[in-house]
Amino acid sequence: MSGEDYEKRLQAWVGRTLGEPRRGQDPVNVPMIRHWVEAMGDTNPVYLDEEAARATGRETVVAPASMMQAWTMRGYAATVNPEPEAGGMEELTALLAEGGYTSVVATDSEFEFHRELVPGDHISVQEQVESISPEKKTALGEGRFITTLRTYRDQRGEVVATQRWRLLRFRPKKTEQTEQKPKALRPRPAINRDNAFWFEAAKQRRLVIQRCAACKTLRHPPGPCCPHCGSFDWDTVEAAGTGQVYSYIVAHHPPHPAFEMPYVVALVELTEGTRLVTNLVGIAPDKIEIGMPVVLDWLEADPELTLPVFRPAVPQEES
């Protein structure tokens, strides 16, 4: 296909309407107006207060002008499962994609309002292609500006507003390949004089538990004194590296560049009786069970950080 033929096919869309008029699912109504003004923080009383509206010469409350487009939106279900419309925007979009204009950004939206909308008005909209520009060089890439005119009518067919809508359909610029960035580091633990011994032992792949030298009570997380007898004297014992899942959560959000989402944060009850917050690896999240036996493994997060993690005592499928 020559460039001239493609240009003719594009320009043939100028002046055409994009599909049939689309009627709003619901008439203008006060509940939706209330939702809108509360979300926007718009306290103008003429939108919800009949008395205030009549005091300004209006017959009743009115809808904010900014809601015009909202009254004809097709809704969630139709957006998730749209039905193709002959001669609609989908066909024009496909033709633009054929020319490599696969990316889009909205550039302008100009409204002209003919009258205010009141509860009971039922709005429809039809869109017409006004112009398709020659190819332009932009900061985003080479593209074309598509200008359409949307005409909004009430249930009597009278024009209540028009909207001139402009999009830039463009070919994304090819970016030069850059050197791969090193993987982000895991967040650094807050190490202090009370817990430094624990992280030093972890560097040596030893999982230790703090023990009161006076009453022999094990404790975790580490602390300066025994919560049972108050002694400041302590030593450590090395954990066997076995335990069970006491509780867990699956983290999906917020994403962090150091972690592969989703990941499992588990509270593991060690055989010795103390509990440790850690990661559970080697198992799909939906296969985890409370009470599941787990064994110690080690994660070399980076050269400066080695952490204990746990995996199922009986190997599991990770998929």
UniProtKB/Swiss-Prot annotation:
InterPro entries: ChsH2_C, ChsH2_Znr, FAS1-like_DH_region, HotDog_dom_sf, NA-bd_OB-fold, Thioester_dehydratase-like. It comes from the Bacteria. One of its GO terms (molecular function) is lyase activity. Residues 199-298 are annotated as: DUF35. Its EC number is 4.2.1.-. GO terms for biological process: bile acid catabolic process; lipid catabolic process. Keywords: Bile acid catabolism, Lipid degradation, Lipid metabolism, Lyase, Steroid metabolism. Heterodimer composed of ChsH1 and ChsH2. Two heterodimers combine to form a heterotetramer. The complex interacts with Ltp2 via the DUF35 C-terminal region of ChsH2. Belongs to the thioester dehydratase family. Probably involved in bile acid degradation. This is Probable enoyl-CoA hydratase alpha subunit. It comes from Thermomonospora curvata (strain ATCC 19995 / DSM 43183 / JCM 3096 / KCTC 9072 / NBRC 15933 / NCIMB 10081 / Henssen B9).
